[in-house]
A protein has these predicted regions:
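Active/binding-pocket-proximal capping segment
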Residues: 42-47, 56-58, 213-217, 224-228
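Extracellular/periplasmic, surface-exposed regions of secreted and cell-surface proteins
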Residues: 1-129, 277-357
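Active-site-adjacent bridging/hinge elements
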Residues: 1-3, 50-54, 75, 167-176, ...
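N-terminal hydrophobic signal/anchor transmembrane helix of membrane proteins
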Residues: 34-38, 76, 192, 216, ...
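Extracytoplasmic gating/loop element in the C-terminal half of outer-membrane beta-barrel translocons
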Residues: 215-313, 318
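Conserved small-residue
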Residues: 66, 76, 83-187, 228, ...
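Flexible glycine/proline-enriched surface loops and loop-helix/loop-strand junctions
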Residues: 6-8, 179, 191
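Glycine-rich, aromatic-lined ligand/substrate-binding cores of catalytic
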Residues: 185-222
Length: 357
């Protein structure tokens, strides 16, 4: 039988969202434009954003889309270009740009039954995680910090009980209380980005070196292995070698868990997203990428004229050749850490010949 389910109440009074913005900046140039500096500041506040608003249960609905949420964005963008050296046969130019971009959710509603914190007061890309306290060297189980800062087991944190003795855990922890178990780690949107381009010219040769910079962001990675029901025929991240075993009691990652040895925690890991919510899977996103490296040679005009051409240039170019960073060990690229199956940023080397007649 066909049925229609209405998940949220309709709202015919929805209207356009509002934005207030302020921009300021200045440009600075000295030494016959050998040094050029540009600084821009912006502030944007969005109000009447469409978001869910919880409703009294007597309305028959739990939530409705309403114009009521708000968010602010602010940042500074700096651009600096310099003419470092210019002689008859050699020149060196530099372009540097840097930006800080931050945002904050000012008003947001979350369902009462939601067990993870809301983003109000935090960035849109806020990452919250359960604060771990290392691995118990005797049992191999993960330890946690409770809201009071005490080291506890998962069973103690959630007050787990197997009331029927059948290996299914229950807890009297409320959703509001569970939200206090989580700590704010950072934002998935890196607040600091930039780029550095150096161009060197010597006679007919030209070398371009382009770096991109990303700092201050975080990424929630997929767990390196399954703590319960591990598939021994599956390819895992090399981090699995750093899990607890009797021969490796000082490991940083917990042991595989068996239902017979710890039925309450096993059941809780199995029925919840606790394992993926641990802070050990949140990595810093700080890296510098050699985005472009190009070496070109302009064939002398005397030769091109003899060949019936106006100009000719030969070059070799490499893209995304190197990444310098921390926190992405055992991952192919920091930009694809969130998904072990994602295609990393490709590296390429190309050769080109440009002829103009």
């Amino acid at each position: 039988e066909d049925v229609i389910i209405i998940n949220s109440a309709p709202n015919k009074k929805l209207r356009w969202e509002k934005t207030q913005s302020v921009n300021a900046g200045f440009d600075f140039s000295v030494l016959n434009q050998a040094i050029n500096l540009s600084v821009d500041y912006y502030y944007r506040k969005g109000t009447d954003l469409i978001a869910l608003r919880m409703l009294p249960l007597e309305t028959g609905f739990t939530s409705m889309n309403v114009n009521w949420a708000s968010m602010e964005n602010k940042g500074v963008e700096i651009s600096l270009s310099t003419r470092n050296i210019t002689t008859k046969n050699f020149s060196w130019y530099t372009n540097f740009n840097f930006a800080y971009n931050g945002n904050k959710v000012l008003q947001e509603n979350i369902p009462e039954q939601q067990t993870t914190p809301g983003r109000e007061g935090y960035p849109v890309g806020a990452i919250f995680a359960l604060k771990t306290a290392g691995v118990n060297k005797e049992t191999g189980n993960m330890m946690f910090y409770n809201p009071e800062g005490e080291k506890v087991t998962l069973k103690e944190l959630y007050r787990l009980k197997d009331e029927w003795g059948i290996g299914i855990a229950s807890s009297d922890v409320t959703a509001a209380e569970e939200r206090t178990f989580y700590s704010y780690i950072g934002s998935s949107d890196a607040p600091y980005t930039g780029g550095l381009i150096n161009t060197f010219s010597y006679k007919n040769w030209e070398l371009n070196v382009n770096f991109s910079l990303t700092f201050g962001g975080y990424v929630r990675t997929q767990p390196s292995y399954d703590i319960i029901n591990p598939d021994y025929g599956k390819n895992y991240n090399a981090d699995v070698l750093n899990r607890w075993t009797p021969e490796n009691p000082n490991a940083e990652l917990p042991a595989f868990m068996l239902s017979a040895s710890n039925p309450e925690e096993y059941s809780w890991y199995d029925s919840k997203t606790i394992w993926r919510d641990l802070d050990i899977w949140v990595k810093k996103l700080n890296y510098v990428r050699l985005q472009n490296l190009r070496l070109g040679y302009r064939i002398p005009e005397l030769l091109t004229k003899r060949l019936g051409m106006n100009s000719a240039t030969v070059s070799i170019e490499g893209r995304n050749l190197f990444v310098f960073g921390s926190g992405y060990n055992n991952y192919m690229d920091p930009e694809s850490m969130y998904n072990p199956y994602a295609t990393p940023v490709p590296k390429s080397v190309t050769f080109s010949l440009n002829l103009n007649f």
